[in-house]
Design a protein with these regions (language model features):
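Active-site-adjacent structural elements that line small-molecule/cofactor binding pockets in enzymes
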Residues: 1-275
Length: 275
């Protein structure tokens, strides 16, 4: 399986420069996660791998509706031939609100994984975006493991129980480095409230115990505090470690601060100490 390290960094695909990738590698982050449904050709992945020496690159996630499995598999093999073991293929079903052809996502995921099998993409080199129990079980059975997004440590604990002890559990969590909670929540709102209209995320948040009132835009203080780690650097790291304590192997930081690199520099030594 691709070595991810304990902590990684999430940005939309195209969001990392080569210089930033090299600095994040030097700072000790283990993986660069490319979000926003990158196309099947996986542009930018090779550039980041070429610019660095050891850090891994992963997708979070390739959308099964828009990226044909055959083309994705070809991209995977091309990358793995040049940079063996350093790329993890994360895939997922996206959102019904965003996809005109949306069918039952579970069936489409199974078909997609079948195609990746036929194309020779190893189980241990792919992972699946998963929130609910059924897709979490599929992730454990058919891939290296699960990539939950917009979740709490309580979800992480339940996901680990479903996946068992051996499957990968790499969890995204948002970060704002600000000791003023009102200001931190305001910074977080644009990157949280979008998901409150998406029923798969809203349903998962309800499963985690949030009420309808919490999910009214822009989201309650209780919801924002649970989904976004904010405060001092020490407090933020402690909040991220709650996912590790709950069973995560890897925590993916999505930094919402205007100067995200400054935040990542500040957090890096504390994250290293926690490992």
């Amino acid at each position: 399986m691709t070595e991810l390290g304990r902590f990684g960094v999430w940005r939309a695909h195209g969001g990392f420069t080569s210089e930033e990738a090299r600095e994040l590698e030097r700072l000790g982050y283990g993986t660069l996660w490319l979000g926003g449904s990158p196309p099947a050709e996986l542009p930018g992945v090779a550039e980041l791998l070429a610019a660095t020496e050891t850090i891994s690159v992963a997708t979070s996630i390739v959308n099964v509706w828009s990226a044909p499995a055959k083309e994705v598999a070809e991209s995977f093999h091309r990358l793995d031939a040049r940079y063996p073991g350093r790329f993890l293929l994360g895939i997922g079903a996206g959102h019904p609100e965003m996809t005109g052809e949306y069918r039952k996502p579970y069936e489409v995921l199974v078909e997609y994984l079948d195609e990746l099998d036929r194309a020779g993409v190893p189980k241990e080199r792919r992972a699946l975006a998963a929130l609910g129990p059924r897709v979490l079980r599929l992730a454990g059975d058919r891939t290296a493991g699960a990539l939950p997004y917009l979740v709490t440590p309580d979800h992480t604990r339940g996901a680990r129980e479903i996946l068992g002890p051996d499957a990968l559990l790499a969890v995204e969590h948002k970060v704002v480095l600000d000791t003023d909670p009102v200001r931190a929540r305001a910074q977080a709102i644009p990157r949280v409230e979008f998901y409150l209209d998406l029923r798969n995320y809203a349903s998962n948040l309800r499963r985690l115990g949030f009420q309808d009132a919490d999910l009214v835009k822009p989201g309650s203080a209780r919801l924002l505090d649970a989904l976004v780690a904010h405060g001092s650097a020490k407090s933020v790291v402690e909040q991220l470690i709650h996912h590790i304590d709950a069973g995560a192997d890897h925590v993916v930081l999505q930094v919402l601060d205007d100067d995200s690199m400054a935040t990542l520099r500040t957090l890096a030594p504390l994250l290293h100490e926690s490992s």
